[in-house]
């Protein structure tokens, strides 16, 4: 029997977090199960590196990405199933998805609220001409895969045929557990993220400054070349895929502040899942999926106001036993609900059902 052929169309190469976690980390498992897998990322690693360096990737380079993806459409019929991350062509109408729905079957995957790039975009022409672009992509798909309930609700409103929730998860084999929660040391509060999300730390800097004045802390920023305006001691570590777990293990407390905006409500709380996989206690804003991952007072704290953040951080800084208890409960939750293999075998059953295996 010939191998079933899967075509994955992620937005980014492996270096892009969403594509790495929603597509690339599963590829060895698909191949191990006997599937023939082809991957075609829309943007290139050169594009990502340019964006992360806060530079423009250049008109011609971006145009090349569009042409390369367009040429792929002439060979889509040879695949048994096509799985798209978000959309085929960013900021173009859903003509490609319409074409695909006529000649093959496709699924589409979302781990953030990309539909707000269209219905709440500052660009007047985008909002005017394509406010429901992602809704159309969802409706034409055979199945919509989403990372959380906020995205699921949008797929329901769009009229998606079938919807499945698959959280963004970790491979637990890669995540060691932090052991040292000694009371006799400087406490490291940490954050991991891409340069584009560093802005989420801005509102919390005054809180960290206050904490620094009252407790022995330092701040660890796993963020590449970016900096933040913190009055206390700060350590900045460039992000690498191979080094991210070791970087998290340098932390004692992991944080995930977020504003209460539509885009942020669609986030999948991946930072928290990473922290908790390493046995860290967490403090997070009660926004979107953060409220599902953090059980307040059991594996971390949810904090909204300045007073709540100060109280939560202060309690964890001064109580090593509480840090350990929260960390154990957090890791347990991750192992039960947010693992790569758990996701994969559910996903595989759906593919088998779709293809009649």
Where are the regions a protein language model picked out?
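Short acidic/histidine- and often glycine-rich active-site loop of Leloir-type glycosyltransferases
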Residues: 266, 286-297, 301-302
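A short, well-ordered alpha-helix in the C-terminal region of glycosyltransferases
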Residues: 315, 322-337, 343-349
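Membrane-proximal helix-turn-helix segments that form the acceptor-binding/catalytic region
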Residues: 67-79, 90-108, 112-115, 124-144
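Conserved catalytic-core segment of nucleotide-activated headgroup transferases in glycan assembly
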Residues: 14-29, 39-40, 171-175, 182-249
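Short hydrophobic beta-strand element within catalytic cores of glycosyltransferases
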Residues: 274-284
